Regions:
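Hinge/lid segment of periplasmic solute-binding proteins
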Residues: 91-146, 170, 199, 281-285, ...
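Extracytoplasmic/periplasmic solute-binding protein
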Residues: 131-140, 145, 167-215, 258
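C-terminal lobe and pocket-closing loops
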Residues: 111, 265-279, 290-386, 418-426
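Conserved C-terminal helix/tail region of periplasmic/extracytoplasmic solute-binding proteins
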Residues: 23, 59, 155, 363-426
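Glycine-centered hinge/linker elements that transmit conformational signals in sensory
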Residues: 173-177, 212-243, 287
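A structural signal for short loop-to-beta-strand junctions that line the ligand-binding cleft
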Residues: 84-85, 114-153, 185-186, 294-298, ...
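Short, well-ordered beta-strand elements
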Residues: 28-39, 58-63, 85-86, 187, ...
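Extracytoplasmic "Venus flytrap"/periplasmic binding protein-like
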Residues: 50-121, 130, 155-164, 252, ...
Length: 426
């Protein structure tokens, strides 16, 4: 045998010996595959190390996945019966995967759990994972939208706090515009964002009717919210521009061109880092409600933990979900990522509930509503954005936009109606 093949064989033998040693070290251990996305996938490992230390018979392989492609990858994995044991899930995906039969029903697990207590979770967030009375995911972190605003400009206009009703809110915006520099706007509502018209609509209406078969956007209830939204542009209180047309949101907010903005918890850190001239002159507030005595609601967002039905290690997978759901672990997760916990006890134990910027999120999370729990919801949200933008830019009247929105959503739901009708026929 020549020297080169001999060296290759020796190298292969050494490699196999190393692998054999690893296999021996892990012999008997259950290996869980856990998909986590974005920053969570990058930062969760210290918690996984703690879990493995507490559960020496379980090893967790974290696979970091990009948000931009993971949805398609999950569908491909389901088709190929190669789904992970546990995965982080955007809350709007739960209905789609549940309809495919991809998810394990977690209802019986929670009933027997001492770690996962439904009463400790924000109700609207928990409800995002409940379909047909069964639980398909456990909230991991929460997201919603509230108002970030320049407290000094509102105070100069005569408002020491953000109003709590729509009529007062619009009066406050008019007063703020009077004290802003020329070209200023009391609120920024980028027309390429679906969240503002969606949130306002959730305050007054059910988005779908007849059991989720048809759009409900031309209804008087949704029209009230949509007219309020479009009116902000037509009165010049908000610019009819997209986020991509604004070179630097934080600079414009700092110099007072925009006095308020509906956004999410990630911007607490961004505002703290990027505002220079007016670092002490901003605050947060819940979304105002349509009328007195009707507190404003916002959208229930965030991510949950699911177990796939195809997992061969469901008991161990549930142990991981339970561990990541413990309040003290959620507090550490918040410190690692900045993500907001879904459990009230984690807020209280961490001091987040008293934080001057986060406490408005804490208050708002007690008043959130899920979007329709159907697989088509993401397409519906983008359709709301399309016609919201058309009306905001003056390309369609309110009634034209709502009629077109209903028609498009009805087309999106055509297959759903067919399936529901077939099911009803037996």
């Amino acid at each position: 045998m020549t020297l080169r093949p001999l060296l290759l064989l020796l190298g292969l033998g050494a490699a196999l010996g190393i692998l054999g040693g690893c296999a021996e070290a892990d012999e008997g251990a259950v290996v869980l595959e856990f998909w986590a996305m974005g920053a969570e996938g990058e930062k969760v490992q210290p918690l996984i190390d703690r879990f493995e230390a507490e559960h020496p018979g379980i090893r967790v392989e974290v696979q970091q996945q990009p948000w931009t492609s993971v949805h398609e990858k999950l569908l491909t994995a389901f088709a190929g019966r190669s789904t992970p044991d546990v995965s982080q899930f955007g809350n709007t995906w739960v209905a789609e995967m549940q309809a495919l039969g991809a998810l394990e029903d977690l209802t019986p697990y929670v009933r027997q759990s001492e770690a996962v207590d439904e009463a400790d979770y924000f109700g609207g967030i928990w409800d995002t994972n409940v379909i047909d009375g069964r639980l398909w995911g456990v909230p991991w972190y929460v997201d919603t939208r509230i108002l970030f605003y320049r407290t000094d400009l509102f105070a100069e206009a005569g408002y020491d706090a953000m109003p709590t009703t729509w009529p007062e809110w619009i009066e406050a915006m008019r007063a703020v515009q009077a004290v802003q520099l020329d070209g200023g706007y009391p609120i920024l509502l980028p027309v390429n964002e679906f969240e503002p018209p969606l949130i306002l609509g959730l305050n007054t209406a059910e988005l779908l009717r007849d059991g989720g078969r048809y759009g409900n956007f031309a209804s008087p209830e949704f029209r009230e919210a949509f007219a309020f939204y479009v009116g902000l542009y037509r009165e010049g209180l908000a610019p009819a521009t997209s986020g991509t047309e604004i070179s630097n949101l934080y600079q414009e907010f700092d110099r007072g061109r925009f006095a308020s903005y509906i956004t999410g918890p990630w911007n607490i850190g961004e505002f703290q880092r990027r505002l220079t001239e007016h670092q002490g002159d901003w605050g947060t507030a819940p979304i105002p409600g349509p009328t007195a005595g009707t507190p404003g609601v916002s959208v229930a967002g965030g991510a949950s933990l699911v177990i796939f039905e195809a997992s061969e290690h469901k008991a161990e997978a549930w142990q991981l979900v339970e561990f990541l759901s413990r309040p003290e672990v959620q507090i550490e997760f918040n410190e690692l990522t900045g993500d907001l916990p879904p459990r009230a006890s984690a807020w209280e134990g961490s001091g987040l509930a008293a934080d001057p910027y986060a406490r408005a999120f804490y208050e708002q999370l007690g008043r959130v509503r899920p979007t329709p729990k159907i697989p088509e919801q993401e397409r519906i949200a983008q359709t709301i954005r399309t016609y919201g933008e058309a009306a905001a830019r003056g390309q369609m009247t309110i009634d034209e936009a709502l009629a077109a929105l209903d028609a498009d959503v009805d087309r999106i739901l055509e297959k759903r109606r067919w399936l529901l009708d077939r099911e009803a026929e037996g």
